[in-house]
Amino acid sequence: ATGRRVVGPAGAVRIRSDAKWSVPEPELTLFVNPLGAIVGYTVGNDMSSRDIEGENPLYLPQAKVYDGSCSIGPRIAVNIGDDGPRAIEMTITRGGSKMFEGQTSTAQMRRTEEELAEFLFREMSFNDGVFLLTGTGIVPPDDFTLASRDIVSISIEGIGTLENPV
């Protein structure tokens, strides 16, 4: 998503009005400087309209990029280096009740953080640097969809917790 479509901690993420199946996607997020070097880490939530995405692969941009489709925060952690795998946890609450909870680890990533950054910078430049969301390992089950006023909480070990209302 572009910067104007991203919200920070406590900012409201959105579900598309024309979507029937929307889910959050918790992702380790890298901050990469203009030279392609990873200089920081944060938490990301890459919202997805699964029903729109599933209709046709060409609809992926509409399913993933819209106002309020991404949140990033709560901070940029620097100098954490390669401390090994990090636990990632997501909880979704509705009306004070836990509706979904899932866990994974950065150990499940198929490519290294450096490989992802290198691939992004092969044919693109970012004068101010870029936040790179690395992909999700937690997706709620097919019978779950987000609702207005849900609270999405994503924690990554050593970085912090990002919480957003829907």
Which residues fall in each region the model found?
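Short, basic/aromatic beta-hairpin or loop at an interaction surface
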Residues: 103-112, 120-133
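Active-site lining segments that contact anionic ligands and/or coordinate catalytic metals
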Residues: 67-69, 85-87, 123, 128, ...
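Charged, cofactor-coupling segments
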Residues: 56, 64-76, 142-166
